[in-house]
């Protein structure tokens, strides 16, 4: 090969290496910062929650979920940053495999949830009922439930009768809340003052007799129907979750391939090693500590 062509090939190889390195560093750094932000928000929310803590269930503590998500994102992304800066093949492979495993688990989870749709709905309804039992004791769940009921015009998990699980709304309770639902279940007229007693004495009534006073459909079905009707938003959410992970796996795979090629080319073209030691260097290039000098 003429010298000019050889130099051009080396330049193109070097350019692709630098482009992939830059892309992977930016990718990892962005998600590292996002992970740190999520972790910080989760810690702050948990500190605030501890002031009023009465429950132990992680389902009822979004702060715990944020902390776990933030820790995973922070650690995995830091591995990606370190691996891409140091060209550490072991860390690069670990980063790629972790992203790939997370992506596969999410895909399998989504498929299983669709196949066992009824069981998934029952699982959600059971968890909502457990949250309703402690509605007035856990501020996190109360805020989430109130928001969902107002925005999606629904009441309870399966239906409005789920509120009988709460000790204050149970029809056998002695207080004024007995047999009622929270005011966030009520039909609202924005021009009128909010009537917090609008849902009283409704749980023991038939659906037809209260459907003009409160929302009778459950929030689980209401949210699922909303996503079904707004499938473009649902598709966007799924792409927003899955596409970055797929992009990370692809970038890391291409970068690993390029680093391995450059390690081999560097060893051969420099003529520093004999035939007997070349294989050993190639084997070391796929190990945990071989870095290409920059």
UniProtKB/Swiss-Prot annotation:
Glycans are attached at residues 118, 189, 230. Interacts with ADAM10; the interaction influences ADAM10 substrate specificity, endocytosis and turnover. Part of TspanC8 subgroup, composed of 6 members that interact with the transmembrane metalloprotease ADAM10. This interaction is required for ADAM10 exit from the endoplasmic reticulum and for enzymatic maturation and trafficking to the cell surface as well as substrate specificity. Different TspanC8/ADAM10 complexes have distinct substrates. Promotes ADAM10-mediated cleavage of CDH2. Negatively regulates ligand-induced Notch activity probably by regulating ADAM10 activity. Disulfide bonds join 154-219, 155-185, 171-179, 186-198. PANTHER family: TETRASPANIN, TETRASPANIN-15. This is Tetraspanin-15. One of its GO terms (cellular component) is late endosome membrane. Gene3D superfamilies: Tetraspanin (1.10.1450.10). It comes from Bos taurus (Bovine). The chain crosses the membrane at residues 24-44, 63-83, 94-114, 236-256.
């Amino acid at each position: 090969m003429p010298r000019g062509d050889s130099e051009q090939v080396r330049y193109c190889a070097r350019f692709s290496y630098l482009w992939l390195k830059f892309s992977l560093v930016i990718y990892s750094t962005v998600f590292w910062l996002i992970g740190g932000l999520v972790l910080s928000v989760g810690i702050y929310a948990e500190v605030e929650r501890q002031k009023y803590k009465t429950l132990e269930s992680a389902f009822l503590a979004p702060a715990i979920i944020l902390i776990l998500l933030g820790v995973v994102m922070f650690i995995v992304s830091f591995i990606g940053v370190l691996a891409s800066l140091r060209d550490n093949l072991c860390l690069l492979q670990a980063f790629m495999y972790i992203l790939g495993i997370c992506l596969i688990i999410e895909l399998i989870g989504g498929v299983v949830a669709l196949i066992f749709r009824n069981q998934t709905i029952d699982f959600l309804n059971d968890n909502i009922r457990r949250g309703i039992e402690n509605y007035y004791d856990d501020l996190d769940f109360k805020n989430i439930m109130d928001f969902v009921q107002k925005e999606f015009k629904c009441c309870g998990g399966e239906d409005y009768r789920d509120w009988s699980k709460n000790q204050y709304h149970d029809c056998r309770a002695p207080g004024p809340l007995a047999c009622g639902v929270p005011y966030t279940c009520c039909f609202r007229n924005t021009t009128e003052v909010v009537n917090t007693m609008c849902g009283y004495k409704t749980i023991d009534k038939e659906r037809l007799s209260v459907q003009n006073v409160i929302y009778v459909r459950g929030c689980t079905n209401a949210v699922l129907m909303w996503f079904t009707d707004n499938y473009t938003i649902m598709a966007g959410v799924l792409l927003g979750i899955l596409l970055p992970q797929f992009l990370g796996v692809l970038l890391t795979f291409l970068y690993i391939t390029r680093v391995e090629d450059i390690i081999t080319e560097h060893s051969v073209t420099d003529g520093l090693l004999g035939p007997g030691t070349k294989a050993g260097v190639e084997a070391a290039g796929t190990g945990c500590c071989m870095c290409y000098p920059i």
